[in-house]
């Protein structure tokens, strides 16, 4: 009795070991790039790599969220959904090439492998669509353009103000110099004009230098005549006066 139970137990162990070996032999794995990124307007490859020693792939389904993208069948080949027929191209291998990406293409993508006798295997990929480098550069230039324009406008305004102040200062200086020169001209002209008017006026006395007259009303011809001559003339005239008086007497 105990021998029979031992035999059954050994047979069970052998069957369990054989079953475990069979399951291990048919088990497979899927490797994917869990997170990928691409630029808007560009393209990206969605790829799931299935590996197994004995299992064979019979069908592969590709979905975006819950929306079918494409199906591959060993018997029927590829079929791409009409909605994505202009942007989805089968390959390489059992993957897909997604073209003309938009920002709305960002999201989760699933690959489902149907195998025999291994069963079904699933993989997940998250795609992030980013703005293209040209758009980013254009946005950066657009953002820096107003700053550059503002700086140029400020510098232009400063230069204009400096130029205006310089012109006004020069004009004010010129006006001041002209006023000073005009004032000096009037100051110099007024005495000359007054003298000319005084000389040309009929009633104004004209000062002339005359030699002093002698005792008999005759003007001395020479202020610096000899004193002896002057005395002789006086004596002669006095003598003539005395003779005239004697004759009348």
From Swiss-Prot:
Residue numbers covered by motif ITIM motif: 234-239
Biased composition (Polar residues): 195-211
Keywords of this entry: Cell membrane, Disulfide bond, Glycoprotein, Immunoglobulin domain, Membrane, Signal, Transmembrane, Transmembrane helix
Extracellular membrane side: 29-148
Compartment annotation: Cell membrane
Cytoplasmic side: 170-249
Reported induction: Upon stimulation and mRNA levels steadily increased during the first 3 days of activation in both CD4(+) and CD8(+) T-cells.
Signal peptide residue numbers: 1-28
Membrane topology according to the record: Single-pass type I membrane protein
Name listed for the protein in its UniProt record: T-cell immunoreceptor with Ig and ITIM domains
Organism, as annotated: Mus musculus
GN (gene name): Tigit
């Amino acid at each position: 009795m105990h021998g029979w139970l031992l035999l059954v137990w050994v047979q069970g162990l052998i069957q369990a070991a054989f079953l475990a070996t069979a399951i291990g032999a048919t088990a497979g794995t899927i490797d994917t790039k869990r997170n990928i990124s691409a630029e808007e307007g560009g393209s990206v490859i969605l790829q799931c790599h299935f590996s197994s020693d004995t299992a064979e792939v019979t069908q592969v389904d590709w979905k975006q969220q819950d929306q079918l993208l494409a199906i591959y069948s060993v018997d029927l080949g590829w079929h791409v959904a009409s909605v994505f027929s202009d942007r989805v191209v089968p390959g390489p291998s059992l993957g897909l090439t997604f073209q003309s990406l938009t920002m709305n293409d960002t999201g989760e993508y699933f690959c489902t492998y149907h195998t025999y006798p291994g069963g079904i295997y699933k993989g997940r990929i998250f795609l992030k669509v980013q703005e293209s480098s040209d758009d980013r550069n254009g946005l950066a230039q657009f953002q820096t353009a107003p700053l550059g324009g503002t700086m140029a406008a400020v510098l232009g305004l400063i230069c204009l103000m400096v130029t205006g102040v310089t012109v006004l200062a020069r004009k004010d200086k010129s006006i001041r110099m002209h006023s000073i020169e005009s004032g000096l001209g009037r100051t110099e002209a007024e005495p000359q004009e007054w003298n000319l008017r005084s000389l040309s006026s009929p009633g104004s006395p004209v000062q002339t230098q005359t030699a002093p007259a002698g005792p008999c009303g005759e003007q001395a011809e020479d202020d610096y005549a000899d004193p002896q001559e002057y005395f002789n003339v006086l004596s002669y005239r006095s003598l003539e006066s005395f003779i005239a008086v004697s004759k009348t007497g």
